[in-house]
Amino acid sequence: LLVLTFLNEHRAGPSKRIVDLGCGYGPIGLMIAKVSPHHQITMVDVNHRALHLAEKNKKQNQLDNVIIEESDGLSQVENEHFDFVLTNPPIRAGKNVVHRIFEEAYQKLKTQGELYVVIQKKQGMPSAKKKMEEIFNNVETVNKSKGYYILKSQKG
């Protein structure tokens, strides 16, 4: 749902810098990289196994517009700012971790940059939406399906 929503809005147009935060084995970032090869994708995760699988999937798909980095949130991604941050946040890590991810996204976004979040209503969507509003001063539900919500905030 996150990939479809994002690509519907940003498939074409000029090249953008996108970070897939908490990429896991890579389904979000790699799909966007494959469908929109003009975008530059940085994929980050703290889990070594996930990064290994993401790297393997990147090679199998022959994607040269993807960089994969180890980082706890965006704390180790230095000297880079992004047009978009996309995340399926690690809900089981707890509310504090999820909220820190939103704060780091705000810091790493360019002005007018956007944070896209996919989250289930029953796994903290109302709390996430409230925190995004608090940080960005805006949040909107841009899509929803089967209990999943796509929330978007823009940095002013």
Question: Can you describe what each PLM-predicted range is?
Answer:
Residues 1-87:
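Conserved SAM/SAH cofactor-binding pocket of Class I
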Residues 120-135:
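Conserved class I S-adenosyl-L-methionine
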Residues 45-48, 97, 120:
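Short beta->alpha hinge that forms the Motif I/post-I loop of the SAM-binding pocket
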Residues 112-119:
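Conserved beta-strand signature within the Rossmann-like core of class I S-adenosyl-L-methionine
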Residues 99-111:
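A short glycine-rich, Lys/Arg-flanked "PGG" loop and its adjoining helix->strand segment in the class I
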Residues 144-156:
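Core SAM-dependent methyltransferase catalytic element
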Residues 87-96:
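Glycine-rich phosphate-binding "P-loop"
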Residues 32, 104-105, 132:
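Class I S-adenosylmethionine-dependent transferase superfamily signal
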